[in-house]
Amino acid sequence: MKPSLALIALAALLGACASNPSGPTTSFSYAVPDQPEGASGYTEKPGWATQKYAVAAANPLATDAGFQILKAGGSAVDAAIAVQMVLGLVEPQSSGIGGGAFLLHFNGKKVEALDGRETAPAAADEKLFIKADGKPMSFMEGVVGGRSVGTPGTVRMLEKAHQQYGKLPWATLMQPAIVLSEGGFKVSDRLHTLIKSDAHLKKDPVAAAYFYDAKGEAWPVGHLLKNPEYAAVLRKIAAQGASGLMEGEVAQAIVTKVQGHATNPGQLSMADLAGYRSQSRAALCHDYKTSVREFRICGFPPPSSGALAVGQILGILNHANAGAIPLENGQPGANWLHLYTEASRLAFADRGQYVADPDFVQAPGGNWMSLLDNDYLASRAKLIG
């Protein structure tokens, strides 16, 4: 019956459109919207199994850096630090030392969560993204420039993780990224696609000189791109720890850039950088049962929405009996994907309604686990048509 009802609804909708009193529009021409981020293709790869260790990252150079650190006797945290420093070079659009991060660590007995997410500048208030006319800024109005820049926490958090679980010297973990920065790395398909389609990098003289040639064209795939300035900052971090970024001349350069933005200055200060501290939070763990076995799933708690969103989606799918839907040629079919999509929508609705910085916002009922309550998820599953 559902397909028939869908066709009836579609026919009614088309009928309403056809009865538009202004008459049909003959000049309509559909315009394909821009992708939010340039795609770099998909390559199917086989699964892998390992008994000792594995490294996964968004770029092969970062993956290899972590692999070499492990082979040298480093810990998982050591490898993660090396991976992040390389990613800041080869995947600058996605992550870097000027941003924030979450780290979930499991030593075989205990799950720990280290919060290195950015924090708002101390001078920020509720009017930060409100225009002079009292209306909220559009996304691009707020995000481009210094206004949206928060206090970076990645390096301070990684430093804390290394103090707890590192085996190799801190400076050693900077070496892969330093070598690649000074010697150069080949521009990937993904990086080329993203800088070619970016509408804002060329407006910044420093970014324009780095990502584009003299004609303003994005560096082609395979171009050897060097970043000695990044290497210089990493050398300071190697020698001084996170303070090499959060204090001194590098910190001052960051603040000057943010506050001095020509059209959208921000409020980040030297005090914000010097005062940043990474926090340890209790991992959010819950039991998940299938028809075959039971799992203990742990993830990062708020301010991350990861553990809650994943837990809610899995719980809602269980109550919707998604596991009873057979695969189609080994792949999920339309009915299963419908349930998954709707479960995700419900989870993200709760994310937008409830999840925020726990230092300022209380969990529903005083406990984040209330969002994973079995009866609550059952009621959410009933909303799926």
Predicted regions and their residues:
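Noncatalytic scaffold domains of N-terminal-nucleophile
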Residues: 23-64, 68, 76-77, 81-241, ...
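Internal maturation/activation junctions in enzymes
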Residues: 32-33, 266, 319-385
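Protein kinase glycine-rich loop
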Residues: 312
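Bacterial N-terminal signal peptides that target proteins for export
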Residues: 1-6
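Flexible, polar/acidic helix-loop-strand segments at domain edges
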Residues: 307-308
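Bacterial signal peptide processing site
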Residues: 18-21
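C-terminal motif of bacterial Sec signal peptides marking the signal peptidase cleavage site
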Residues: 14-16
